[in-house]
Amino acid sequence: MRLCDRDIEAWLDEGRLAINPRPPVERINGATVDVRLGNKFRTFRGHTAPFIDLSGPKAEVSAALDRVMSEEIVLPEGEAFFLHPGELALAVTYESVTLPADLVGWLDGRSSLARLGLMVHVTAHRIDPGWSGCIVLEFYNSGKLPLALRPGMPIGALSFEPLSGPAARPYNRREDAKYRDQQGAVASRIDKD
């Protein structure tokens, strides 16, 4: 069962759930909290590697990732990031989220954006118990026109689901947690699997 707006507010008030900066009540609706787009992005450089062998030797995977991923792009205030049709890019939420060991989060894109072809998360929409940090967004433009994305715009909604008990291995305590405390548009770390 997911938390309703009253429970989300109570968990925030009690410090069991943290969203920084704390959203105003107008952004807590029914069973979700609206999140906004941050100002950090990362893109893919075209034609810099013939392919990425996802199950290949880790050193080769790491080298291919280094070739295809851009450095992090930090947009100045007021500027837009343009996502062209068929492009994939990474970005982050403006808000940082910290979940306790007994709560899982779910990120959903906005229907209004999806109707323009914008996918906010390609597949990874679960936020693990024990997570702390900004949430990386996996943008894909499946539409016909470039989309101007501006930091601060509403980009998605988070919902929260209590677990039957605290997780034995929450994300913040796992040795293999590749994205712990991320604040920027962190590239894939599949080579760390």
UniProtKB/Swiss-Prot annotation:
EC primary class: hydrolase
Organism in which the protein naturally occurs: Klebsiella pneumoniae subsp. pneumoniae (strain ATCC 700721 / MGH 78578)
Matches recorded under CDD domains: trimeric_dUTPase
Job description of the protein: Catalyzes the deamination of dCTP to dUTP.
Active site (record annotation): E138
Designated name of the protein: dCTP deaminase
Basic and acidic residues bias: start-end ranges: 172-181
Recorded metabolic or biological pathway in which this protein acts: Pyrimidine metabolism; dUMP biosynthesis; dUMP from dCTP (dUTP route): step 1/2
PANTHER family: DCTP DEAMINASE
Gene Ontology terms: biological process: dUMP biosynthetic process; dUTP biosynthetic process; nucleobase-containing small molecule interconversion
GO terms assigned for molecular function: dCTP deaminase activity; nucleotide binding
Reaction equations catalysed: dCTP + H2O + H(+) = dUTP + NH4(+)
Domain of life: Bacteria
Catalytic activity, EC: 3.5.4.13
